[in-house]
A protein has these predicted regions:
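Generic detector of well-ordered alpha-helical packing
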Residues: 7, 47-48
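C-terminal helical "lid" subdomain and adjoining coupling/linker elements of P-loop NTPases
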Residues: 17-19, 23-42, 137-145
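Soluble catalytic regions of large protease machineries
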Residues: 40-45, 51-192
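P-loop NTPase motor core
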Residues: 1-16
């Protein structure tokens, strides 16, 4: 439940609901933090990169809002508006989601001939998605319809946290190569 505390209005407006949602999801605005014009520009290009790349990807949701206001740990954000509920996610949708995540880094590279640390969370999320595609969803032509590794989402008392992978070092290297190939293919697509 969202409660508007700062307003004395009798009715809650749509804007107040949206502002409260953004505050909960992205964190409070950092009003006391002074951001240089250079950092604002880098963030603007980065967030625009996400939006532009997403616009050209048919499986991605439309952009709802872009902000370069720092909130939480983020220098800015691009928020999407889901068109419909997604029960199943295709390989193409996941690949395009990775491409969209890397759109910010691509925009930095194209506009500044340099990159910065602002894309670290995007890269982490893109890598995680690619890893799931390869090791969990069987979406690798090279490695086939096999699940690799243990489900790390389930924690039980007494579980052996130092358990070894259920595959060889050769397979581990192949998994790493496949993950890198997926991410780099989508980065190349974002740069286009």
């Amino acid at each position: 439940d969202l409660i508007v505390v700062d307003s004395v209005a009798a009715l809650v407006t749509q804007q107040e609901i949206e502002d409260a949602t953004i505050k909960v999801v992205m964190g409070a605005e950092k009003k006391s933090h002074i951001v240089s014009d250079k950092d604002k520009k880098v963030t603007a290009y980065h967030e625009a990169g996400h939006a532009i790349v997403s616009y050209f990807l048919p499986t991605q949701d439309p952009v709802h809002q872009i902000s370069i206001i720092q909130r939480g740990m983020a220098a800015g954000y691009t928020m999407y508006l889901p068109v419909d509920e997604k029960g199943h996610t295709s390989k193409n949708q996941l690949s395009e989601q990775i491409c969209s995540l890397l759109g910010g880094r691509a925009a930095e590279q194209l506009t500044q001939d340099d990159v910065c640390t602002g894309a670290s969370n995007d890269i982490e999320r893109a890598t995680s998605l690619a890893r799931q595609m390869i090791t969990k969803f069987g979406m690798s032509d090279r490695l086939g319809l096999v699940t690799y590794g243990h489900d790390n989402n389930e924690v039980f008392l007494g579980r052996d946290f130092s358990s070894t992978p259920n595959y060889s070092e050769k397979t581990a290297a192949a998994i790493d190569e496949e993950i890198e190939a997926v991410v780099m293919k989508q980065y190349a697509k974002a740069l286009e």
